[in-house]
């Protein structure tokens, strides 16, 4: 980060830690002072690529690579146009193709690849899907409002819970001070032994703690995302494609050698007589001696029947 700097005035973050770099739609950076100086009229051209820019479009650089800031801004603009959802497509494959098209457009605009055709494609899509874009935009706005309302409600409930716990804690502290003062008064005035008074005080304290009202649990009907508990989101089901059930077919590998005995038959046929037994720590990991023996036999038998023609 220390080598980041303004390409015009050559000021770096190493020499000026409070340097604020700004980035525009072209992806090239300028410091805040240079932006104020060059765009005093509200508009101007980029010092590196001569792209016409507006002063109001400059934003603080968030990432070390300004290209990422450029990609983020481009993606925001594209997603406002390409705002279809999965339920707008008859199949999952078409929805995935739609997402892939978005990524291709963002990639082209970010890296300045085939800009004319890409912008032409965006304009054509915007004209053909004007109604769908507007409908989804209204739907997103409504959902955003519902989410903000749910978050505000959750925040209010958390505040009420905090105040309730605070009052409960203050009440308990007040009762402790009161009981302590009563004990001191009894020790001064009573003729009973101190041990009996302390035992009585301890019993009263336990009863008082048991009688203290437990904090009420604030049950909510919705999650923080706005989804009601116990409810399901209504969505268009994905079209089910009827296909034949999968049938397992054993894999046959031609080894050009004798058939290797099954792993369960190795001990009966004497193959494990001279194989080191597995240690307890090996067994814990699932290893048994027959596995290594079976693999060694596969390597030994492989290619014994091979004949060159």
Swiss-Prot record:
Compartmental location: Nucleus
Keyword annotations: Cell cycle, Cell division, Metal-binding, Nucleus, Zinc, Zinc-finger
GO CC annotation terms, alphabetical: transcription factor TFIIH holo complex
UniProt-listed GO biological process terms: cell division; DNA repair; nucleotide-excision repair; regulation of transcription by RNA polymerase II
Superkingdom of the organism of origin: Eukaryota
ZnF start-end (RING-type): 6-50
GO molecular function ontology, one term from the record: cyclin-dependent protein serine/threonine kinase activator activity
Domain UIM intervals: 142-161
Pfam family, one: zf-C3HC4_5
Oligomeric form and interacting partners: Associates with CDK7 and cyclin H.
NCBIfam families given in the database record: cdk7
Role played: Stabilizes the cyclin H-CDK7 complex to form a functional CDK-activating kinase (CAK) enzymatic complex.
Protein name: CDK-activating kinase assembly factor MAT1
Gene name in the database record: mnat1
């Amino acid at each position: 980060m220390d080598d980041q700097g303004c390409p015009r005035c050559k000021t770096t973050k190493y020499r000026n830690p409070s340097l604020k770099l700004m980035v525009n739609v072209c992806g090239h950076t300028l410091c805040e002072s240079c932006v104020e100086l060059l765009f005093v009229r509200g508009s101007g051209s980029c010092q590196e690529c001569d792209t016409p820019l507006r002063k109001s479009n400059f934003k603080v650089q968030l990432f070390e690579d300004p290209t990422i800031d450029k990609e983020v801004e481009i993606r925001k603009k594209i997603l406002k146009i390409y705002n279809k959802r999965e339920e707008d497509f008859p199949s999952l494959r078409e929805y995935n193709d739609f997402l892939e098209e978005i990524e291709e457009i963002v990639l082209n605009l970010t890296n300045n690849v085939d800009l004319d055709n890409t912008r032409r494609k965006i304009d054509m899509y915007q004209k053909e899907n004007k109604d769908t874009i507007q409908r989804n935009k209204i739907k997103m706005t409504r959902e955003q409002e519902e989410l903000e309302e749910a978050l505000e409600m959750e925040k209010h409930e958390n505040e009420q819970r905090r105040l309730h716990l605070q009052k409960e804690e203050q009440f308990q502290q007040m009762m402790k001070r009161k009981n302590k003062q009563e004990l001191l008064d009894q020790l001064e005035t009573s003729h009973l032994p101190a041990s009996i008074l302390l035992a009585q005080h301890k019993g009263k304290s336990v009863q008082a703690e048991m009688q203290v009202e437990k904090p009420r649990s604030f049950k909510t009907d919705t999650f923080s995302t706005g989804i009601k508990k116990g409810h399901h989101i209504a969505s268009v089901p994905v079209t089910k494609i009827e296909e034949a059930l999968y049938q397992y077919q054993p894999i046959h590998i031609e080894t050009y050698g004798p058939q290797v005995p099954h792993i369960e038959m190795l001990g009966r046929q004497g193959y494990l007589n001279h194989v080191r037994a597995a240690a307890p720590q090996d067994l814990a990991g699932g290893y048994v001696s027959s596995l290594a023996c079976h693999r060694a036999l596969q390597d030994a038998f492989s290619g014994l029947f091979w004949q060159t023609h």
